[in-house]
Swiss-Prot record:
Plays a role in limiting the replication of viral DNA in keratinocytes. Recruits the host NCoR/SMRT complex to viral replication foci to mediate repression of both viral replication and transcription. GO terms for molecular function: DNA binding; DNA-binding transcription factor activity. This is Protein E8^E2C. Pfam families: PPV_E2_C. It is found in: Host nucleus. Residues 98-111 have a biased composition (Acidic residues). The keyword Glycosyltransferase does not apply. One of its GO terms (biological process) is regulation of DNA replication. Belongs to the papillomaviridae E8^E2C protein family. Keywords: Host nucleus.
Amino acid sequence: MKLTVFLRPSRDRPDGVWVASEGPEGDPAGKEAEPAQPVSSLLGSPACGPIRAGLGWVRDGPRSHPYNFPAGSGGSILRSSSTPVQGTVPVDLASRQEEEEQSPDSTEEEPVTLPRRTTNDGFHLLKAGGSCFALISGTANQVKCYRFRVKKNHRHRYENCTTTWFTVADNGAERQGQAQILITFGSPSQRQDFLKHVPLPPGMNISGFTASLDF
């Protein structure tokens, strides 16, 4: 059996020739072995894959730069211009921009003013043939409590009842007199039934009258 030991390629032999040491069967040292396949032929082999070019090779001279710069460019590919751009905006364009800034955004919602309700729902406090009333007065707390009890327990004994109201004075929101409510009845007999079954708390006053429409 013949055993040959290969050493790394000599840098002075670019042709890929390997130098073998003395073998076990007495081969003299320094004997040239069979030339190895150059690395350049293996680069395109699909079985070997990519191999670093220049492995064991010596590059002659400096590597050329992949980009060629013109003389006096200082090695820069892009040169920035420091000259400012000067110009004037046309008058019509400036006025148009000013109008756009002043014009409101069309997407903004404008407040919608709803018309006041004027539909006649058929309710009238006074009837054409005359109406019977009971005017009840007292402190604000008394009148509110009385109206609450009447509406809750005696709703079938009258027709309509107003909210608590005051008579205004001459200056601003000044009030004069006591708080009052107005209760309407369909007939004098209904008002008598109301006065009979609905007691009036102490400190409150009641007055009855009949009113008719003049127009």
